Design a protein with these regions (language model features):
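Sec-dependent signal peptide recognition
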Residues: 2-10
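Hydrophobic h-region of N-terminal signal peptides that target proteins for export
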Residues: 10-18
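Exposed acidic/polar residues on beta-strands and adjacent loops within beta-sheet cores, strongest
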Residues: 20-163
């Protein structure tokens, strides 16, 4: 028993040392979200800067627009590395590219997600924010596969929270 506890403490310490957090969120009796967030590592990415009104800012990470900052004046603090949904015990990966600073605490919570069932598919709605740079993502889930259909800062994509 003592050895098991020591091993668990060692694993948790190791993960925290490298800035990795993960967890599970229960959506309903048949649906769960599994997530993994890592500390942002500048050595693993490429960067492009833009200039607007004499303001230089980080506009692209790995040649793509990125989400999680109001203007890209700083590097992201962390990165959403993995997101999966389990529906009726079928685990389905969700696209997480371009998604940074998903929450101020570095963890995700049930209140950030809503799963809606339609006739032949589901839509998973989510919002992410670390206090600045809020964005919304929507995934269509059908036949054991997912497609991210929205990744946006536009207000219209947050309206699902008002329903």
């Amino acid at each position: 028993m003592k050895t098991t506890i020591q091993v668990l403490v060692l694993i948790i310490s190791f993960l925290n040392l490298f800035g990795q957090k993960n967890g599970t969120i229960k959506i309903d009796d048949n649906s769960f979200i599994y997530w993994e967030i890592e500390q942002f590592d500048t050595s693993k990415h490429t960067f492009e800067y833009c200039l607007e009104s004499d303001l230089k800012y980080l506009c692209k990470i790995d040649k793509q627009d990125w989400f999680g900052s109001d203007r890209g004046l700083d590097f992201p603090k962390n990165e959403l590395k993995k997101l999966e949904i389990s529906i009726s015990q079928t685990r389905i990966p969700l696209e997480t590219s371009q998604m940074f600073n998903p929450n101020f605490s570095g963890a995700l919570f049930e209140s950030q997600f809503e799963l809606k069932r339609f006739k032949d598919h589901y839509i998973l709605f989510a919002f992410f924010s670390d206090g600045a740079g809020s964005y919304s993502a929507h995934w269509k889930i059908e036949n054991g596969k997912s497609e991210r259909i929205v990744l946006s800062i536009e207000e219209e994509f947050f309206e699902w929270q008002l329903e």
